[in-house]
Amino acid sequence: MLIGKRISGRYQILRVIGGGGMANVYLAEDIILDREVAIKILRFDYANDNEFIRRFRREAQSASSLDHPNIVSIYDLGEEDDIYYIVMEYVEGMTLKEYITANGPLHPKEALNIMEQIVSAIAHAHQNQIVHRDIKPHNILIDHMGNIKVTDFGIATALSSTTITHTNSVLGSVHYLSPEQARGGLATKKSDIYALGIVLFELLTGRIPFDGESAVSIALKHLQAETPSAKRWNPSVPQSVENIILKATAKDPFHRYETAEDMEADIKTAFDADRLNEKRFTIQEDEEMTKAIPIIKDEELAKAAGEKEAEVTTAQENKTKKNGKRKKWPWVLLTICLVFITAGILAVTVFPSLFMPKDVKIPDVSGMEYEKAAGLLEKEGLQVDSEVLEISDEKIEEGLMVKTDPKADTTVKEGATVTLYKSTGKAKTEIGDVTGQTVDQAKKALKDQGFNHVTVNEVNDEKNAGTVIDQNPSAGTELVPSEDQVKLTVSIGPEDITLRDLKTYSKEAASGYLEDNGLKLVEKEAYSDDVPEGQVVKQKPAAGTAVKPGNEVEVTFSLGPEKKPAKTVKEKVKIPYEPENEGDELQVQIAVDDADHSISDTYEEFKIKEPTERTIELKIEPGQKGYYQVMVNNKVVSYKTIEYPKDE
């Protein structure tokens, strides 16, 4: 039991999240980097099987050499106590197979969005000379945001490798297997392209194109049967999209896309207006194709040689007898004429069936597939017209035969030509474009076309409330009005935005938040002793208020504390006179440190012969201090620090 086990002292296994024939996948915690990872562990049954170990390691080596947003990242590879493991990126979501089961068939636009990511990943692998060889929805992950990750390169092979496995022991899944793999050929880049076409078919229809009771029967269908039309199960599929499937799944690799990049380019342009109604993709048969030459047996050669000898001998004999026969020829000619006349009379009167074709009743082939219907007609001795005509029918499924011309049970002569009519299904109507209309207008327009199964999905959008912003199927799609459903996506207007509390936001952060939510900033400024300069002081409407995109929000930003003026302080200073000898002059220096003076400079200098009083003026800034000192004969006699005066 691996749950709870710590591998390599680093990966704590939490629970099982998946598994396959070769390995199980667990959710684990990387305790060093504090993140969730997926860890694939080779089954214990194969821990001693060198081939499986080699294939397991190849998966890590193949994927780790690739760097693409749609390929699962490989973090680590190792072995501990016969536990072989690969540590990889954890994708929180589900497999594409599970997604199709839950949501299929998908809308063509969603299907192509998914396929574009998958094909981009495979194109990157091909550029690095790696063929995946097991492309299927089970090996593709999709997260909750619709992002795709291709995984499971367990049987991927480098094209330059000398260990490419031939498919006589077929690896991969038979439902997605290319014809060349099914017949035992090499898996190439074009084999991956074939599998991509099958995946696109499954996305659009919710089903696989070929199924059967055994792997062999399915493989035979890949070899022999044409890929069915996706439109049969999803009429909303444009021809440009179906053509991608048909080209990718061509039986001969020569007729497929040359590269995955070519397929990706077609996917990106499939909904361009000039492509939506393009002609169906078909493969032109080469008129100069080599025809089979029947084998001539030895006996036939001998017979032909004998006949030639007989001709030569007869010619020689005839030459000898020629003169004798000339006399008998009128009697011979008369005898031959009598024989032919007698035979003609007998043929017309006694044996008419020898010259007249027999009567045949045309069988009823309605509801049959073309091959079965044509076979039945030919069995009755009838010729089948090469051109099959199409006709709508309310009861017979699309693609099956409806009727013949002449009609069933009509008696005709053997060898007569019969024309087949194939059902296109129930009569279809091309749905109009109702986007941009109000929901009531759209419903009326659709009802006028006969569409009664209309559902509405309401979403927030910038368009006015009640406006149709999307329709599914898209305009121009042919549908059966009495059966097919039309889904309208209708705007209920922009979603309300609940304002955040913008306090402590800088001007840049506040304006960015409002812009991201489509709100207009009305900027104001005010002094604040509490809020640092440049930050939000207040907002209007208040935090928690619901507003619509486009509304104005008034935001007041702090200018910081309001600046006070510098103040002048007057100080009276008494200077003592204390000479060593009476009558000596004393040198006085006054220094001031304030807004206008530096303590290193002399504010005032003079001489005294008696005690003196002076008034000093100091200019002090708010929050600052003033200072003065008095020196007599270079000796400090007084000094003082003065605070900024408080307001009265």
From Swiss-Prot:
Quote any Pfam family the record assigns: PASTA
Q: How is it modified after translation?
A: Autophosphorylation on threonine residue(s) and serine residue considerably increases the kinase activity of the protein. Dephosphorylated in vitro by PrpC.
| Modification type Phosphoserine: residues | S214
One GO BP annotation here? spore germination
Membrane topology value: Single-pass type II membrane protein
Q: Which segments does the topology annotation call Cytoplasmic?
A: 1-330
Question: Domain PASTA, which positions?
Answer: 356-424, 425-492, 493-559
Q: What is the effect of changing T313A?
A: Unchanged activity
* Extracellular compartment segments: 352-648
| Biological role | Protein kinase that is responsible for triggering spore germination in response to muropeptides, signaling bacteria to exit dormancy. PrkC is thus a germination receptor that binds peptidoglycan fragments containing m-Dpm (meso-diaminopimelate), which act as spore germinants. Autophosphorylates and phosphorylates EF-G (elongation factor G, fusA); the latter modification is likely necessary for germination in response to peptidoglycan. Another group did not detect phosphorylation of EF-G.
Q: Additional info?
A: PubMed:18984160 shows that peptidoglycan fragments serve as a novel mechanism of interspecies bacterial signaling that likely indicates the presence of growing bacteria and thus serve as a signal for dormant cells that growth-promoting conditions exist.
Its protein name is: Serine/threonine-protein kinase PrkC
Taxonomic lineage of this organism?
A: Bacteria, Bacillati, Bacillota, Bacilli, Bacillales
